[in-house]
Swiss-Prot record:
Transmembrane segments: none
GO molecular function, one term: ATP binding
Pfam families found in the cross-reference section: RecA, RecA_C
Name of the coding gene: recA
The protein, known as: Protein RecA
Species classification: Bacteria, Pseudomonadati, Pseudomonadota, Gammaproteobacteria, Alteromonadales
Amino acid sequence: MKIDANKEKALSAVLGQIEKQFGKGSIMKLGENRSMDVETISTGSLSLDVALGAGGLPLGRIVEIYGPESSGKTTLTLEVIAAAQREGKVCAFIDAEHALDPIYAQKLGVDIDNLLCSQPDTGEQALEICDALTRSGAVDVIIVDSVAALTPKAEIEGEIGDSHMGLAARMMSQAMRKLAGNLKQSNTLLIFINQIRMKIGVMFGNPETTTGGNALKFYASVRLDIRRTGAIKDREEVIGNETRVKVVKNKIAAPFKQAEFQILYGEGINRTGELVDLGVMHKLIEKSGAWYSYKGDKIGQGRANAGKYLVENPEIGAEIDQALRAMLLGGGQAVAQSATGDENVDLETGEVF
């Protein structure tokens, strides 16, 4: 595109003036000297990484994970921390609920000796700690568990029964304005865990909403709705949950996709089970009757035994994982089906009804 010579001269002058006043890089052409690829961190689930479209959660952005109680919200964030630590990244956990179990975190692969943890007294304190860690540029991933537990100072100092209308929403709105720019500059991923509440008097549509006002919905680049869809049983004993995650908002790739995986108690996401299922779906693993084979070699009779084989032979599991990522993320092929066809979507917030 050719620009008029006078306009080009005026543009050059104003750009020089802006850079002189605010520093180099304060304004630039979008395609100039910058990577268009978004750096991501794996969620610990291959199918969710694929559903997100970019291979994981984006650094430098705000992410919201919400769902009912015991749906796997904290487990998913601990899996993200474990994946980030394996890449040598520094992580922090702001435990506003005062409920983090370090033994469980360790079982999921989290290096608790190098995990920063804070249990703030008030919501303002939690968000100030977030801001300080972000501005330091030394922390790569920050988890806040949860928005519902970020209690304003005025509410803590007041009495039970006092009215504090909109205090938490105002606090979150101010924090979002302050944090968004700092997160981008320091390339820090900030994940908020949120709880679900019911709107009173809703006759039509979805009565569910999240706590903390609307600011987080708008500032979040990715919003994940996590639900437990069933139980995994070993004979009579329940050993885990069937889990479904919907990507209800996504600013880095196509939204409204969903992923299904298993969360095993005391172990976390069942990665080998995912590899077997996706491997069969995309013809990397052959299934003949109950037997599973990889490159002509039998790896197990039944899904559980095939998964056990991949646990015992991690190099083969890693090979299948890399092949699936190259196929599904490199080629842009999505494993998860779009949810837009059979569900209503709130275009303002990206929520699926």
